[in-house]
Amino acid sequence: MGKPTQQSIEIPRLKGGGIQPRVAVHPATVTRFGGEAMWFLLRDPIGWRPNPGDEQQYHPADVPAGFVTDLASVPWYLWNWLPNDGLYLHAAIIHDWLYWDQARARDEADNVLWIDMTDLKVGYLTRQAIYQGVHLRGQGAWDANAALKASGEKRVLKRFPDDPVVSWDEWKKRPDVFA
């Protein structure tokens, strides 16, 4: 199978043209786990709603408080240009949730990322870089999440750590912390 080409990527279009009223629900509040790995805990629920006219094509997404995410999965060598906590933070968490939950097609999850970044006024070139990165290379993360879930891993906490140095790897070994 050859390398995907630029022409094989279809950027989602917003009905009615242009940006509709913002559909991000609640700002994202996260806390970083301790340790070397970059894992974050979503402190409050967030959500995303389709723009008016797009309700038939896209479905709302609600991310529960306690969801554990790596935010934007950007390779370390791109962090100066695309930090994992950029303007697209909210969209990255929604996207991580959709990739974890897998209740909809991967293409829809990627399109929701694009639309949410558009509504959050993320610059076009940044949106393109992130969208194309996940759209062309996200299958590995999608498959890895499916395998982790099948093996019993959970990503939604009911109990949050109060120790700032506890790592995600340590915390997830405690059976009484999951929702």
Over which residues does each language-model region extend?
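Extended terminal accessory/targeting regions
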Residues: M1-A179
